[in-house]
Curated annotation (Swiss-Prot):
Protein name: Ribosomal protein uS12 methylthiotransferase RimO
Organism name: Afipia carboxidovorans (strain ATCC 49405 / DSM 1227 / KCTC 32145 / OM5)
Gene transcribed to yield this protein: rimO
Keyword 4Fe-4S assigned: yes
Cofactor remark from the record: Binds 2 [4Fe-4S] clusters. One cluster is coordinated with 3 cysteines and an exchangeable S-adenosyl-L-methionine.
Binding site for [4Fe-4S] cluster 2: 148, 152, 155
Cofactor dependency: [4Fe-4S] cluster
Domain Radical SAM core: 134-370
Database matches in PANTHER family: RIBOSOMAL PROTEIN S12 METHYLTHIOTRANSFERASE RIMO (PTHR43837), RIBOSOMAL PROTEIN US12 METHYLTHIOTRANSFERASE RIMO (PTHR43837:SF1)
Intracellular or extracellular location(s): Cytoplasm
Catalytic activity entry: L-aspartate(89)-[ribosomal protein uS12]-hydrogen + (sulfur carrier)-SH + AH2 + 2 S-adenosyl-L-methionine = 3-methylsulfanyl-L-aspartate(89)-[ribosomal protein uS12]-hydrogen + (sulfur carrier)-H + 5'-deoxyadenosine + L-methionine + A + S-adenosyl-L-homocysteine + 2 H(+)
GO cellular component terms listed in the entry, alphabetical order: cytosol
Length: 440
């Protein structure tokens, strides 16, 4: 590093939106201390790799990213979920500068300071009030808690990130307000278990504006809806009180729920240690759609869980036909070091997992195509993510970034990223919509 030249850091962020928020917090602190971000590893003084350790495939991706950083730079700091169990990382890469687990912001900063001292003292005015974001300017993830109190047998998140720790309501709302003032049009509310928000702090009230707001899922959602941006609720565990948020939907609280049901067969759900009354869940879904006809449901499922029989898998397919989930992600079960599900009997062979994954996704493709076809001829509000010469790419209220479908928008007038426009839907395929800006 040349004398008087700001030190440069290259940053790789892997994993889920919660991990992305952790990366944003680290980058915000580093920028406050005068560090600059480099676009390439070989143009940086050091590299930070924020890892994912949830699945073996994610671990391999993390190890690959570390290897790439070592090859192109050689001075590498590793953090994130995989860093909570550093043995495999140390075995492959013994010459790393530091390895830390998730949420260990101070340890990461200490490692940076040791390897690359800041050029000058922090000047907070280097930063925008909302901090540094890795998402596009028009949307941002808003993390309301850390950790999880559930003990799903397939999951090691509580071991990596600990039990639930909720942020005070006023703290969340202040961050959200800063984001909206900075131009964010969509807030994506995330955590490991969004609907458990506030349980650990006994729903403690805090002062916000001229009133008190309790740290409850529904109360927080209501207040976020007053800020003027779209509010999208993700990672919602299906607790009974989730029913209370449905009547809030239709304005800025988007008619969208991301609920990871994981399966539909009662016995499989018991082995997963998940809520098992899926007949009641179907009744709740029907009630939600009666209250909010425009509701979009996204969910994730696991096929090939240990002991899953053909009959149990068929229950999942039948349930899906009844539930008519709008957006679906599916994972083939894979053992994760430290997960209690590893001890379950009757593992499902890989070829059967693949066959079931294909069958589930084919079933969902038909459901998705049918549900999207109903939107042809309607008008939808669309937020623009990308612009081209004649067609822009955006998302309706039914689409979360990165994981859901898109709306392809033809327009005679120029559109900008972040614009929210009314689009007349003219065509649908299995996952996406196509239309043109209304009024032209």
């Amino acid at each position: 590093m040349n004398q008087g030249v700001p030190p440069k850091i290259s940053f790789v962020s892997l994993g889920c939106p919660k991990a992305l928020v952790d990366s944003e917090r680290i980058i915000t602190r580093l920028r406050a201390e005068g560090y600059e971000l480099a676009r390439k590893h070989d143009g940086a003084d050091i590299v930070i790799v924020s890892t994912c350790g949830f699945l073996d495939s994610a671990k391999q991706e993390s190890l690959g990213a570390i290897g790439e950083a070592m090859a192109e730079n050689g001075k590498v700091i590793v953090t994130g979920c995989m860093g909570a169990e550093p043995e495999q990382i140390e075995k492959e890469y013994p010459n790393l500068l530091s390895i830390t687990g998730p949420q260990q912001y101070e340890s990461v900063l200490d490692a940076v300071h040791r390897a690359l001292p800041p050029l000058h003292n922090p000047h907070l005015d280097l930063l925008p009030p909302q901090g540094i974001k890795l998402t596009p300017r028009h949307y941002a993830y808003l993390k309301i808690s850390e950790g999880c109190n559930n003990r799903c047998t397939f999951c090691i998140i509580p071991k990596l990130r600990g039990d639930l720790v909720s942020r005070p309501a006023d703290d969340v709302l202040r961050e959200a307000e800063k984001l909206v003032v900075a131009g964010v049009k969509e807030l994506l509310v995330v955590s490991q278990d969004t609907s458990a928000y506030g349980i650990d702090i006994k729903y403690a009230p805090s002062a916000w504006k001229d009133r008190e707001v309790r740290a409850r899922f529904v109360d927080l959602a209501r207040e976020l809806g007053e800020l003027g941006a779209w509010v999208r609720l993700q990672y919602v565990y299906p607790y009974p009180h989730v029913d209370d948020v449905i009547p809030l939907m239709g304005g800025n609280i988007l008619p969208y729920l991301d609920i990871p049901f994981q399966h539909a067969n009662t016995e499989v759900l018991k082995r997963m240690r998940r809520p098992a009354a899926q007949d009641k869940t179907l009744a709740r879904i029907h009630k939600w759609r009666e209250q909010c006809p425009d509701l979009t449901l996204r969910s994730t499922f696991i096929v090939g869980f240990p002991g899953e029989t053909e009959s149990e898998f068929q229950d999942l397919l039948d349930w899906l036909d009844e539930a008519q989930i709008d957006r679906l992600g599916c994972f083939k079960y894979e053992p994760v070091a430290g997960a209690t599900s590893n001890a379950l009997e009757n593992p499902v062979p890989d070829e059967i997992k693949t066959a079931r994954w294909n069958a589930l996704m084919a079933r969902q493709q038909k459901i998705s195509a049918q549900r999207l076809k109903r939107k042809v001829g309607t008008r939808q509000q669309v937020i623009i993510d990308e612009v081209g010469p004649s067609v822009a790419k955006g998302r309706s209220k039914a689409d979360a970034p990165q994981i859901d479908g898109s709306v392809y928008v033809a327009s005679r007038r120029p559109l900008k990223v972040g614009d929210i426009v009314t689009v007349k839907i003219e065509r649908a395929d299995e996952y996406d919509l196509h239309g043109s800006v209304a009024g032209f």
